[in-house]
Amino acid sequence: MERTRSKPVRNLPETIHSLLGLKSHMTSDWVKSVCNIAKNTSSTSKKEEDDFVSVDLQSIRDQLSALTVQVNDQNKLRRQILNEFLDLKGNIRVFCRVKPLGATEKLRPPVASDTRNVIIKLSETKRKTYNFDRVFQPDSSQDDVFLEIEPVIKSVIDGYNACIFAYGQTGTGKTYTMEGLPNSPGIVPRAIKGLFKQVEESNHMFTIHFSMLEIYMGNLKDLLLSEATKPISPIPPSLSIHTDPNGEIDIENLVKLKVDDFNEILRLYKVGCRSRATASTNSNSVSSRSHCMIRVSVTSLGAPERRRETNKIWLVDLGGSERVLKTRATGRRFDEGKAINLSLSALGDVINSLQRKNSHIPYRNSKLTQVLKDSLGQDSKTLMLVHISPKEDDLCETICSLNFATRAKNIHLGQDESTEEQAKKEAVMMNLQKMMEKIEQEREMSLRKMRNLNETLEKLTGKPHVIEEEEKDVVREVIHVTPKKPRNKSRRASDVFPSFMRPTASSNRRLSGADFSVTPNSSSFKSRRNSMISVRAESACLPVKKKKNRFDSACDSSDRSVSKSTSIMRQNTADDATVYSQDISECDIKLVVSEHKPKPLQMGPGSATKSRSNISNFEKDVMQKIGGTEFSRINSWLRSQSENRSYVLDKTQLPATHFLENLNRSLEKSPTQSFTTEKITGNELEGIEETKTNETVVNPTLMLKKLFELQCLCSAEEEDQILSRFPIPGYEDDDESRYPPILENDGFSQHIDNEWFGVNNYSADWERDSPATIPLLECEPDLKQLLPELGLDRSLKPRGLAVAEGAAPPLLRAQETLGERGKGPTFMQKLQALCFRILLGLGFMDVGFGNDFFNGLTK
């Protein structure tokens, strides 16, 4: 074996030389010729393969074009047959659904029914029969109802307008028929799901938009624009209705969301249902107090066989048609029921005019008929489901509902037909239905072939076959859900500056360009009610070419945006319990009266300087925070109390002398303390701001005790301590009994008292400040000589403590003027105040609160 291995090694040089000799016989032309042969062979095979693929592609495209034409013809034929079928049934088809009886209700109801008739047993010998296109028995299911409605959904794809609405009294099952339950969906989810199914089976491109609104007391509200709010929150204004040049109804500023699947519409529907107006009535604990309307718009640009490029279907849940005599409603419930019945009556008038083919149709008598104008007449398809109750207690409402349905039945056909004509019509409808089913089967086969060819084409070319259509920019409304901003508790920088350094209202208006001044960092004040964070949806039109987010930025509008909210101010009575649907103020104004309660200062012999400095600092702080004109807080408090005389503290009259004696006793125990009025300059007041929040804060009226503590610390005792020593017979000692009642939930008054808030054009009328009189000088003539020296002569005039500007006694002058004087005038001022307190304690003077004031508290 070793020899065999060594033999190739010895022959290796010979082998290499032989290979080199073989290479010497080859030339460069031979190499080029081999390369050319290889290139020609590959190009020929590639060309043959490309020719084969191109032939297949062309064949597939031809087949797709032929199938497209075939499907279009089938759609046109199906649309014609369906239109004939619906015309034979009538432009407005009226169904009746009988509510099943409960387990505890009567077993023998006065209502009997079959598949087409409803029989009302009025007495033992008298009965009345009502004819319908279809009567659904109490044991009928949601599937049975939708089976009759499905042809109308198909006509929507063909470009026809449609309207389906539920009619009947409250509690007969209208909402159940329209909405249903999770395990038994109603017409709304089934119709929308069927609409998307028809779109998927079609060979055209469709765009679907969803809108939802309600008609509450004659006003149109967009349910997708805002969630359910409290009565004090602003709601959008009533939407306006317009008619475009093509005769189509257009609702201005109505949010129109572009949707791509059923789940998106379902989410939007749940959002809209939360904003509906519902309330408790005698007929139902959760009664719908408005008409809920759902609009689904369908647009297809590349379908010439359609009736319209854009059509719509309305799904309407009408309000309860029960009489006010049954509900015994009052107040807001009465107004709601009246508005519902008026709109339903207008709907009946429109249907009656269509039945008689009058030249004038009264669409403008109600917002409901204006909105449904293009869905009730002409070539629209309308279905009305009348809901009745078989209970004997609801017999009157049942008869009213059946009479209304009779007016709407057979508008196109006119008079009732004979039995033979009706049998012939039913036979024709059966033939048309069979033809339509056959065409739909052929159309389904053609669509299946088209899908298979598209898959093959996608494998060959890498992209599917797309029907060429003009690509246009879509203007969509983007919904921005903006939560309420968190509260900003920081003080504004302008609050620490004097009034003359703060910007005026006119300068703010010039800088901002707005009609009113809005503070950029205004703080949010707490409301009287604990409210949840409200969410608002604002729309903006943005031109985009490609959709980024399906739900967040998918709405379509013709270059519109949602208008700003305006509303009305109204008092909320106990009857105004409707969810969200309360009137509120057009401009939210926050009125905050800040109260400063410094601790009482003990005026000892060695603390006069310290007390004076504290009072001076306190007055300076007040001067920086509050601006206004000179006024008397005591008379302002009197004026506010005289305005609130409508409140009753107790049924018993309070004796005025009793309070005067208590007040004099309390003043006798604090002889070293004084009280002064203040002179306030400036034209701004902290706490009065015009903001854009939805909540209002109204502080209770300041009591006399708080005014004394605020300005002069006249008494070291609290008012509750004083009142506790002098209990009133028959008067309970609680927080509510000590003070006059304040505004809670009864309403809100925008009245701003000029005396409190320092209006610029305020002029103090000191001649009418206080109704109290002091006949002290008439009783004690010897005091007339002493009081002018003390500067107290003017304070004893019939106006009590109300002093005129420029003539105030020294003890009632502002503290800022006292700070500029020397020790002598200051000592005289304190001496005068001491004399004044002594006179008050001895009973020679009073504070000006006469019997009229205390009598007014009990009126």
Swiss-Prot record:
InterPro entries: Kinesin-like_fam, Kinesin_motor_dom, Kinesin_motor_dom_sf, P-loop_NTPase. It comes from the Eukaryota. Residues 91-411 form the Kinesin motor domain. The keyword Membrane does not apply. Residues 518-530 have a biased composition (Polar residues). GO terms for biological process: microtubule-based movement. PROSITE patterns: KINESIN_MOTOR_2. Gene3D superfamilies: Kinesin motor domain (3.40.850.10). Keywords: ATP-binding, Coiled coil, Microtubule, Motor protein, Nucleotide-binding. Residues 511-530 are annotated as: Disordered. ATP binds at G168, Q169, T170, G171, T172, G173, K174, T175. PANTHER family: KINESIN MOTOR DOMAIN-CONTAINING PROTEIN, KINESIN-LIKE PROTEIN KLP-3. Belongs to the TRAFAC class myosin-kinesin ATPase superfamily. Kinesin family. KIN-14 subfamily. This is Kinesin-like protein KIN-14T. It comes from Arabidopsis thaliana (Mouse-ear cress). The gene is KIN14T.
